[in-house]
Amino acid sequence: MLPFLPEPSLSYTQQNRTAVLLLNLGTPDAPTAQAVRPYLKSFLTDRRIVELPKWLWYPILHGLVLTFRPKKSAHAYEKIWFKEGSPLEVYTARQAAALAERMPDLIVRHAMTYGNPSIADVLAELKSQGVGRLLAIPLYPQYAASSSGAAVDKVCEQLLLQRNQMSVRTISRFYDDAGYIDAMKNHILRYWAEHGRGKKLMLSFHGVPQKHYDLGDPYPDECRHTAKLLAEALELTEDEYTVSFQSQFGRAKWVTPSTQDLFGKLPKQGVTELDVFCPGFLADCLETMEEIALMGREQFYEAGGKNYRYIPCLNDNPDWIDALVALAEENLGGWR
């Protein structure tokens, strides 16, 4: 059994501060194979991500995936890396800073399920600052066991090590939150006003294996519900938008339709002008900037497409920060 973590030199009456912790997936520390490998290892050894027996999965992971994938992934990260660091880390930090500015009576931090800043390190910092109440917000509007579930797992792992445990609240999902929907609507309308509008809007969400859905993961249904609400807010007809799922890997069957498949099919169906937005990603990252903005464009044009626009994620959009503040205030309740 692991020992309890040391408690800070604070009396119990001093451990009464409230904090908001924004949680995102994670990123390697640098766009190099050496940095990507430990990140992938921590990610792909989580039972929330790969639901296979260790005896079956670990030989594949260590013998193939961690041998060949880091170099390929590092090359992809190089294409989208900012001077300040990983886009996901940069934008998530900006969201936390904006939230802190709007809620100055609280401590606001961000942490990653995998990589840095780690949930363990940030919770230790908050404990030392006298935080006794924590609102953890996984930055995934649609709940999936492999995203929101994994993030909350990491928080709970640290609670198991605390002798004097924090009080913790989490927000498991907000796929139908009015502020979130309104922020996306305004963001897309502004983009269209500035850059023009295609014939169809693709709403691309991260995929999950079909088996996860069959076993009770509500994620695909929540994605489709979000898409419906957003389409209604934008006053789109059913012919003017489509919903798809991206980022599949491995040989298992994933939920459909596949974003990558549609890049090849839509031009052949007469859709040669396409806009793509990813409602489930609240910060631009590898899956949006490289997979959709760069590779998706190539796939669409190779299939005969003529005009392709990637609409960036909400990132630190002021409307999204407004929605995030409202979401936090609603769930903090009497803690403020």
From Swiss-Prot:
Stored Gene3D superfamilies? 3.40.50.1400
Give the pathway annotation.
Porphyrin-containing compound metabolism; protoheme biosynthesis; protoheme from protoporphyrin-IX: step 1/1
Localization per record: Cytoplasm
Query: In the UniProt record, does the keyword Ion transport occur?
Result: no
tRNA processing in keyword set: no
Enzyme Commission code? 4.98.1.1
For Fe cation, which residues are the binding ones? Answer: 206, 287
Q: In this record, what's one Pfam family?
A: Ferrochelatase
Supply one GO molecular-function term.
metal ion binding
What's an example GO cellular component term for this entry?
cytoplasm
Q: Which UniProt keywords apply?
A: Cytoplasm, Heme biosynthesis, Iron, Lyase, Metal-binding, Porphyrin biosynthesis
Primary site of residence:
cytoplasm
Q: CDD domains recorded for this chain? A: Ferrochelatase_C, Ferrochelatase_N
Q: Which GO terms describe its biological process?
A: heme biosynthetic process
Instruction: Identify which top EC class this enzyme belongs to.
Output: lyase
Q: Which reaction does it catalyse?
A: heme b + 2 H(+) = protoporphyrin IX + Fe(2+)
Extract the InterPro entries matched here.
Ferrochelatase (IPR001015), Ferrochelatase_AS (IPR019772), Ferrochelatase_C (IPR033644), Ferrochelatase_N (IPR033659)
Q: Which domain of life is it from?
A: Bacteria
Q: What functional role does this protein have?
A: Catalyzes the ferrous insertion into protoporphyrin IX.
Q: Which NCBIfam families match?
A: hemH
Q: Which family does it belong to?
A: Belongs to the ferrochelatase family.
What name does the UniProt record give this protein? Ferrochelatase
Q: What organism does the record attribute this protein to?
A: Neisseria gonorrhoeae (strain ATCC 700825 / FA 1090)
